[in-house]
């Protein structure tokens, strides 16, 4: 039998799941295995499946799967449509040739895209006029995909545009699909063998300045951000919030006037960290606040450098509009969503308590989060993990998979659900759900993660539409486990992945809002009948070590959301298991501690002490050949406050670069 529908042969079970849902695919495969195989025939250029119960499904040439006609009476997608494709694939499996796969040419779709409604093409042109940038992925053997600022497009068939899926509310043949095809065509014309590229769309009819600071609005934004940075470094964030209110407000309004989404989002995140510091929030992290402040200024500096390279004919690594998030919408409506939990974190401060649950869309790999908070007075009777969200207990959501209709995603990755858009189903999280996920979220081991962290762009140019320090790693064996009472932290060292240096450090601090999480972690790592096989969590550098803070631990049979534990589990083992940091690590930790001290208390209140500490530290850094960082610390004595602030920001960024480099060296 000759293959008349090559696009159907390209649809993998993962693609069919994305185009329909996991339930239809699972049931279809089971029915085919049980012998319920429909009769496949062709009639008038249409593929027809006739089932034993009389149901007839017809898919015409050029139709999307959901456009197929089926006599079962189902509204929209049904299992018969999925079984038609799977049966056709099985029928063709024995007759397919083993010819080498032809190179993908998305240009074949341009003519078809030109026939789309005017409204769709105008929306695409409007996005191009804003200078939109698109991240393209085309690795051999994998599904071509395009990541736009607020949506993701995947081409499940290289033969038919009808099987392209976007996660926006339209789902397919939308303006995002149009732009993705155009970007691939333009990029392949210059780099035929591309596997990963960031491509900027340019309009022939609209010209915009190549210098982001050439106009008054851009220049004002940079000045207000610099003034805010100077005020925070010199005065310290421990000063009353009223001291910084006006500076934050001016910078935020200036970023919004420029429509620079990642600059305004950086300001929002920094303000949230400062507020968390004053509210004594359990989720406040001094190192994170330090990075946010340094990256804010560096983002604008990088934008100017990218614009400069572009102006002299060089191709910048990242377009400046991507760096600042130019023209990115605040919200985007999403299509039918199937989300897999990555974990939950409970938190509290002096007035409120709350939680945040992270999910990933297995079809696109994007990460979303769901957040809620309540008055602290309700915490004793209603702990965060037992609160109900959309009629489901938070703990069940944290350890489950959810399906939602007509949701929205904010620019920072928050999942927005109105009361009427309730979650339609929640099922327990299974190991199979995580196995469907791919890199960079799911890494094959700690060695691969170190390499990924070393190679990825610095934080100051990465987009802020989702968290990028959340990963899933394999766990083979727990080597050591102990409770550090001085740090109130449970530490473990486990084998993760292949390689010589494959020891992963897990560290989970105790928290009053999830007091039994550490006990559950200890119990899971000690059990042998159903050992931990995978772990999700946030990576950072603790005591000089690349460390993962666990959120969910997956055994062979089930998932355990650690912060969802509401009862005592087992006593904690008492021992210190972390290795003594190397001299180089200790120096970087001293440098980071000095910068945190300056951030908290302000330069002007500890100038002489800070200069003395910086000079001593610079001498020690020079002894281990950290000459650049030593030079930066030497600039702290500079009498010009602007130069000193720039030096402190550079010190933060250098430490961030050096920690992964030391890890890579072992």
Stretches found by the model and what they are:
Residues 1-666:
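Long, low-complexity, compositionally biased intrinsically disordered regions
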